[in-house]
């Protein structure tokens, strides 16, 4: 389920929605993105230890996608739904969105998300 195209597209869409709605002058943008994604998937407030786990996962994935742009672009290219104006984004922005997409995909796989409905 985690690697199905539709799941990857849903995660990418969630990441885009959360990332693109943040004001670029916000302090601690990454925490806000993590919180927004968490609330959309699990419909409850995020606890501090949960936030830190998401941020750690995001940072690890961002580092990996920075070091392997080909892998990043392949991951962002899966499926039909694409990030709007993706070609206009910087390498850093694409790495962030890929990392947030990976993080969102992990959120969808939590047992709490799978059994909520």
PLM feature spans:
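Substrate/cofactor-recognition hotspot
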Residues: 1-117
């Amino acid at each position: 389920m985690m690697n199905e195209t539709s799941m990857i597209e849903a995660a990418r869409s969630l990441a885009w929605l959360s990332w693109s709605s943040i004001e670029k002058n916000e302090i601690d943008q990454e925490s806000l993105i993590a919180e927004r994604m968490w609330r959309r998937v699990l419909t409850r407030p995020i606890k501090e230890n949960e936030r830190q786990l998401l941020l750690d996962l995001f940072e690890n994935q961002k580092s990996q996608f920075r070091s392997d742009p080909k892998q990043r672009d392949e991951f962002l290219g899966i499926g039909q739904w694409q990030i709007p104006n993706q070609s206009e984004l910087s390498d850093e922005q694409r790495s962030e969105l890929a990392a947030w997409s990976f993080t969102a995909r992990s959120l969808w796989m939590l047992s709490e998300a799978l059994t909520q409905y």
